[in-house]
UniProtKB/Swiss-Prot annotation:
<dbReference type="InterPro" id="IPR036179">
    <property type="entry name" value="Ig-like_dom_sf"/>
</dbReference>
<dbReference type="GO" id="GO:2001222">
    <property type="term" value="P:regulation of neuron migration"/>
</dbReference>
<dbReference type="GO" id="GO:0005042">
    <property type="term" value="F:netrin receptor activity"/>
</dbReference>
<feature type="topological domain" description="Cytoplasmic">
    <location>
        <begin position="401"/>
        <end position="953"/>
    </location>
</feature>
<keyword id="KW-0053">Apoptosis</keyword>
<dbReference type="InterPro" id="IPR003598">
    <property type="entry name" value="Ig_sub2"/>
</dbReference>
<dbReference type="InterPro" id="IPR037936">
    <property type="entry name" value="UNC5"/>
</dbReference>
<feature type="disulfide bond">
    <location>
        <begin position="87"/>
        <end position="134"/>
    </location>
</feature>
<keyword id="KW-0677">Repeat</keyword>
<keyword id="KW-0472">Membrane</keyword>
<dbReference type="InterPro" id="IPR000906">
    <property type="entry name" value="ZU5_dom"/>
</dbReference>
<feature type="signal peptide">
    <location>
        <begin position="1"/>
        <end position="32"/>
    </location>
</feature>
<feature type="glycosylation site" description="N-linked (GlcNAc...) asparagine">
    <location>
        <position position="117"/>
    </location>
</feature>
<feature type="transmembrane region" description="Helical">
    <location>
        <begin position="380"/>
        <end position="400"/>
    </location>
</feature>
<feature type="disulfide bond">
    <location>
        <begin position="324"/>
        <end position="359"/>
    </location>
</feature>
<feature type="disulfide bond">
    <location>
        <begin position="268"/>
        <end position="305"/>
    </location>
</feature>
<feature type="domain" description="Ig-like">
    <location>
        <begin position="54"/>
        <end position="151"/>
    </location>
</feature>
């Protein structure tokens, strides 16, 4: 029978008589008390026999019901005539009480003990505002006493932890905090930590604390702290185990000390020394990072080489002495011994008989005695003869020189001293009497070699060009070149003779550097070809201009990677144009469609109504990674209505224009001016854009704050130039050399974080240590420069050095680290160069000095390869050797395919001027020609020989 039934049944009878019984006891006690003290209170002198209220010796304790087992509540009081339990405000039935009565021998008072059982069902059926509770009520003849309330709850422990500990990887001596929230239970579970199934005693290890809200804290991690940690929760019902958390304590590698510098690897001259260090202090453990930096350092060393002495030439013999001997001497000065070198071996003085043995001391033969006058006369005759010979030779040299000048094809110099150093590298080739005429550096041993160095361009016009085309073969000795013969000492040092060029005077040949002459060729009222630049767009842009004529030239936008090459002859004779080029730095007018992105700046060249007779070359930088075929790249042009239309795909075949895609730039051959741009459509998620990442820093208004700005822009020079310009206005300084980041088109975002900030010198403002940029914002970063700002604060004004790492990484992609090590004081900061200086000077170069290949050499190359050849030695092989293997139909439509190929070569090599690559290509063609000659029939050889003679090849 349940507790409710007992309360309803037996409890009702108890309520009827228990109060009355208590009232009787109370009345009796009151009457006795009234007889002694007017009924107010018992006197203190009365013994505790029948005049004491019940005192509880044992009160009921809180209890928990485990599973279905009932619990017993007991209480004990003295003196007590009766004890009853009251649960949840209701009396417990008398039948449910079990009581015992004993006598306290020390006091002689009765001691009554009562207990009851409480079942799980009784507790579950109770629905009160508080827990199930019971208390004892004891009666004596003086009154009643109540015990404390004892709560009865059903014990349980849930299965699942509210929070399982998570595995951690921490550096050695770092802090480890493992969180554990045990399952809900009654009573609350106690937590114990296990390491590798062994209990952890925090009292025996001061480094471990398990008292903080069930968490495990290891203050300084040691290698021995690595292991599997388990949180154990237990109460009187059950035990529960959490998931194991693996803790790995790793050790980042540290460099050992540098070794001493090794000895120089060469005994003399320029060599190197090295020193090394190992990543063993400590060695990386448990997946710790390997040491950053180089394990080997090298420096150059220069040791003075010992120079052995060498004799000068012997001096002239001295005058014959009275002893019939004359002397000659030499000195050890060619060169003198230096740096411990050996002294010259041999005699420094030599003597011999000067009379062929006919000299007799004190008695000379009669025929050897000459008057003094005769000897003087012979000396005069000797010197007179030598003088006459010198004069004759000088007259002969002058006569030959004048004769050759009168017979030369060219009457005046068309290059000055400035042209000899006109900005391109020297072009060396050797001419041989026999061998392949196409080889720039023939492998055959010539019997006569003339070495020439072309140090400047040649300014030649059409009539002169025709004469040049009828000269001898391409690399035979040139009749229009005179060579200055230098001393044998210069030849021994390998210094090539400098060639001087002479040409006929021409009315349309202008001196170098006089570019202004082009603009003054026509009267001001007759200038239909000079365009006004006021019609240029007024948007934010970079712009450069130059005046060009028939000789052509090059227009360069400094530090942007954009350039324009006007070939020789592209502009008709006696015409000149003011050509401009600009880059849009505002909001791009080309709006991307779908997945298409802008890969280059919008470049405008003009004037748009200018007509050229030969395609010009426009170089536009781009930011696509073209090493893999994941892009579909298009060239687009803006129409007069402001719309963009596709000109061609880079991989398509076209005869209207030609695109050559290099890793960082696209070279386009065009015949009309306008606004052009490159767009790309990623074919797969592996398409990669090249981003340039850089960090700038500057002090803020608060003297303790320092601002870092991290930029991620397209890897084009003009995009970074815009960033540099903005930072200069804000007072920012470049803190680390920019680096390249490959950003995939996989839709994952970019994270930028600041790491390794000195903890006691600097602190970073909250919530700014790591910033995330959405993918679309980075993928279309050409709209405006993308940057994230970080604010650092110094603890004290005395801190002037800042060191930290900036990590730029794409989720599931590549990452780049910028190591900042700088002083925040501008006076102590090392300046980092923004751009190479090669574009910063001469934005407009006109005439021959703008080209790397001398014009005469260019004309002969074109004459050689434009003519079809039975052996395949034509312009197609020239294109192949210059890595031009596609869309050859474009060159076939040109009047001179070789000239267009060389124009493309000029555009690709505008910075390096690598004439060696062109020389190697021609040399390779020469070898192929030789191989074909060896396997051909004699008739074919003879025919080709006659053909070469007729065409001057």
């Amino acid at each position: 029978m349940g507790r409710a039934a007992a309360t309803a049944g037996g409890g009702g009878g108890a309520r009827r008589w228990l109060p009355w019984l208590g009232l009787c006891f109370w009345a009796a006690g009151t009457a006795a008390a009234r007889g002694t003290d007017n009924g107010e209170a018992l006197p203190e002198s009365i013994p505790s026999a029948p005049g004491t209220l019940p005192h509880f010796i044992e009160e009921p304790d809180d209890a928990y019901i485990i599973k279905s087992n009932p619990i017993a509540l007991r209480c004990k009081a003295r003196p007590a005539m009766q004890i009853f339990f009251k649960c949840n405000g209701e009396w417990v039935h008398q039948n449910e009480h079990v009581s015992e009565e004993t006598l306290d021998e020390s006091s002689g008072l009765k001691v009554r003990e009562v207990f009851i059982n409480v079942t799980r069902q009784q507790v579950e059926d109770f629905h009160g505002p508080e827990d199930y509770w019971c208390q004892c009520v004891a009666w004596s003849h003086l009154g009643t006493s109540k015990s404390r309330k004892a709560s009865v709850r059903i014990a349980y422990l849930r299965k699942n932890f509210e929070q399982d500990p998570q595995g951690r990887e921490v550096p050695i001596e770092g802090m480890i905090v493992l969180h554990c929230r045990p399952p809900e239970g009654v009573p609350a579970a106690e937590v114990e930590w296990l390491k590798n199934e062994e209990p952890i005693d925090s009292e025996q290890d001061e480094n471990i604390d398990t008292r903080a809200d069930h968490n495990l804290i290891i203050r300084q991690a040691r290698l021995s702290d690595s292991g599997n940690y388990t949180c154990m929760a237990a109460n009187i019902v059950a035990k529960r185990r959490s998931l194991s958390a693996t803790v790995v304590v790793y050790v980042n590698g540290g460099w050992s000390s540098w070794t001493e510098w090794s000895a120089c690897n060469v005994r003399c001259g320029r060599g190197w020394q090295k020193r090394s260090r190992t990543c063993t202090n400590p060695a990386p453990l448990n997946g710790g990072a390997f040491c950053e930096g180089m394990s080997v350092q090298k420096i150059t060393c220069t040791s003075l080489c010992p120079v052995d002495g060498s004799w000068e030439v012997w001096s002239e013999w001295s005058v014959c002495s009275p002893e019939c001997e004359h002397l000659r001497i030499r000195e050890c000065t060619a060169p003198p011994p230096r740096n411990g070198g050996k002294f010259c071996e041999g005699l420094s003085q030599e003597s011999e008989n000067c009379t062929d043995g006919l000299c007799i001391l004190d008695k000379k033969p009669l025929h050897e005695i000459k008057p003094q006058s005769i000897e003087n006369a012979s000396d005069i005759a000797l010197y007179s003869g030598l003088g006459a010979a010198v004069v004759a030779v000088a007259v002969l040299v002058i006569g030959v020189t004048l004769y050759r000048r009168s017979q030369s094809d060219y009457g005046v110099d068309v290059i000055d001293s400035s042209a000899l150093t006109g900005g391109f590298q020297t072009f060396n080739f050797k001419t041989v009497r026999q061998g392949n005429s196409l080889l720039l550096n023939s492998a055959m041993q010539p019997d006569l070699t003339v070495s020439r160095t072309y140090s400047g361009p040649i300014c030649l016009q059409d009539p002169l060009d025709k004469e040049l085309m009828t000269e001898s073969s391409l690399f035979n000795p040139l009749s229009d070149i005179k060579v200055k013969v230098q001393s044998s000492f210069m030849v021994s040092l390998g210094v090539s003779e400098r060639a001087e060029y002479h040409g006929k005077n021409h009315s349309r040949t202008f001196p170098h550097g006089n570019n202004h002459s082009f603009s003054t060729m026509h009267p001001r009222n007759k200038m239909p070809y000079i365009q006004n630049l006021s019609s240029l767009p007024t948007r934010t842009e970079l712009r450069t201009t130059g005046v060009f004529g028939h000789l052509g030239g090059r227009l360069v936008m400094p530090n942007t990677g954009v350039s324009l090459l006007i070939p020789h002859g592209a502009i008709p004779e006696e015409n000149s144009w003011e050509i401009y080029m600009s880059i849009n730095q505002g909001e791009p007018s080309l709006q991307s469609d779908g997945s298409e992105v802008l890969l280059s700046p919008e470049v405008t060249c003009g004037p748009p109504d200018m007509i050229v007779t030969t395609p010009f070359a426009l170089t536009i930088p781009h930011c696509a990674d073209v090493s893999s075929e994941h892009w579909n790249i298009h060239l687009k042009k803006r129409t007069q209505q402001g719309k963009w239309e596709e000109v061609m795909s880079v991989e398509d075949e076209s005869t209207s224009c030609y695109c050559l895609l290099d890793p960082f730039a696209c070279h386009v051959l065009l015949d009309s001016f306008g606004t052009y741009a490159l767009t790309g459509e990623p074919i797969t998620d592996c398409a990669v854009k090249q981003l340039k990442v850089a960090v700038f820093g500057c002090m803020s208004c608060n003297s303790l704050d320092y601002n870092l700005r991290v930029y991620c822009v397209d890897n084009t020079p003009c995009a970074f130039q815009e960033v540099v310009s903005d930072e200069r206005h804000q007072g920012g300084q470049l803190l680390e050399e920019p680096k390249l980041l490959h950003f995939k088109g996989n839709t994952f975002s970019l994270q930028i974080s600041v790491l390794d900030i000195p903890p006691f010198l600097w602190r970073i403002k909250p919530f700014t240590a790591c910033q995330e940029v959405p993918f679309s914002r980075v993928w279309c970063s050409n709209r405006q420069p993308l940057h994230c700002a970080f604010s650092l604060e110094r603890y004290t004004p005395t801190t002037t050095q800042l060191s930290c790492k900036i990590c730029i990484r794409q989720l599931k992609g590549h990452e780049q680290i910028l190591q900042v090590q700088t002083s925040i004081l501008e006076s102590e900061r090392e300046t980092i160069t923004f751009f190479a200086q090669e574009d910063s000077t001469f934005p407009a170069q006109t005439g021959p000095k703008a080209f790397k290949i001398p014009y005469s050499i260019r004309q002969r190359i074109c004459a050689t390869f434009d003519t079809p050849n039975a052996k395949g030695k034509d312009w197609q092989m020239l294109a192949q050797k210059n890595s031009i293997n596609r869309n050859l139909s474009y060159f076939a439509t040109q009047s001179s395919p070789s000239a267009v190929i060389l124009n493309l070569w000029e555009a690709r090599h505008q910075h390096d001027g690598d004439l060696d690559s062109l020389a190697c290509a021609l040399e390779e063609i020469g070898r192929t020609h030789t191989k074909l000659s060896n396997i051909s029939e004699s008739q074919l050889d003879e025919a080709d020989f006659n053909y070469s003679r007729q065409n001057g090849l």
